């Protein structure tokens, strides 16, 4: 059994295609491709933590039809677009097969896995539990996972602030649009946090993100793959040394 993380599938949400620059022609096409990529990645015995905004529709029949097709058990963290799903679960209106698929649902989670601790919220939480546990380097085993901000300037801002804090925030946006529309493994989440460590300068970190003198190449942090060319890597919020002169960036 493996565990996976994802967020912001937005099944059935036509408008999110343009918002994220998703490569789908319709909500129906998007649904089919999201299900296909999920099932290519997730085995039947796996557990997937979905961190909010599972579907735009609150119709129990629609929600059930999607859930029944997905591999694995789904442990939900509710997001701001999950009121319909929350209501359907509370009122027992999902099919029996779908109700079993949604194994558990909460607003916030903390899970231990392989000596690491994953904190999960739909919303990014820079001041997460354990953030300042610097003694015995415990904070290096704590990771804050979130969704909500998609591939937006807010995503870039949080990423920038996370890396150049001391100690660095270990915060990862697991939104599906950043990860090829597939749930990711704990190892992918951890590597996304740690790949920028050891940067000698802001410029080196930008080069690791694929941004050189020619500008943004459209890639992102670690394994991230941004889906929206209109935002791209660092386009929304470009961090430079003169913007934060009080931080010693030479040591990061």
Please give the residue ranges for each predicted region.
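Core catalytic region of metal-dependent phosphoesterases/phosphodiesterases
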Residues: 2-108
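Single, functionally critical "micro-switch" positions that shape active/binding sites
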Residues: 7, 147, 226
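Activation segment
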Residues: 13-15, 58, 129, 153-155, ...
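A short, polar/proline- and glycine-enriched secondary-structure boundary/capping micro-motif
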Residues: 16, 129-133, 244
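Structured loop/turn residues at beta-strand edges in well-structured enzyme cores
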Residues: 43, 72, 139-140, 169, ...
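Conserved residues at the C-terminal ends of beta-strands
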Residues: 51, 147, 222
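Conserved beta-sheet core of the metallophosphoesterase superfamily
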Residues: 98-200
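Cysteine-centered metal-binding/redox modules
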Residues: 198-252
């Amino acid at each position: 059994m493996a565990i996976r993380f994802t967020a912001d599938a937005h099944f059935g949400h036509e408008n999110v295609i343009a918002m994220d620059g998703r490569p789908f022609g319709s909500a129906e096409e998007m649904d089919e491709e999201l299900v296909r990529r999920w099932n290519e990645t997730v085995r039947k015995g796996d557990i997937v933590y979905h961190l909010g905004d599972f579907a735009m529709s609150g119709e129990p029949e629609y929600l059930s039809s999607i859930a029944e097709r997905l591999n694995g058990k789904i442990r939900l963290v509710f997001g701001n677009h999950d009121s319909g799903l929350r209501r359907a679960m509370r009122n027992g209106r999902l099919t029996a097969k779908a109700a079993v698929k949604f194994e558990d649902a909460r607003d916030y989670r903390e899970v231990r896995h392989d000596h690491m601790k994953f904190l999960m919220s739909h919303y990014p939480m820079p001041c997460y539990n354990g953030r300042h546990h610097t003694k015995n380097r415990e904070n290096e085993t704590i990771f804050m996972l979130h969704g909500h901000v998609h591939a937006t300037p807010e995503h870039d801002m949080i990423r920038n602030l996370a890396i150049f804090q001391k100690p660095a925030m270990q915060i990862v946006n697991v939104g599906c649009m950043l990860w090829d529309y597939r749930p990711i493994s704990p190892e992918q989440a951890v590597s996304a946090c740690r790949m920028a460590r050891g940067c000698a300068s802001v410029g080196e970190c930008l080069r690791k993100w694929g941004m050189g003198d020619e500008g943004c190449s459209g890639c992102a942090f670690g394994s991230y793959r941004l889906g929206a060319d209109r935002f791209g890597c660092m386009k929304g919020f470009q961090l430079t040394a003169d913007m934060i002169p009080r931080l010693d960036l030479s040591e990061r």
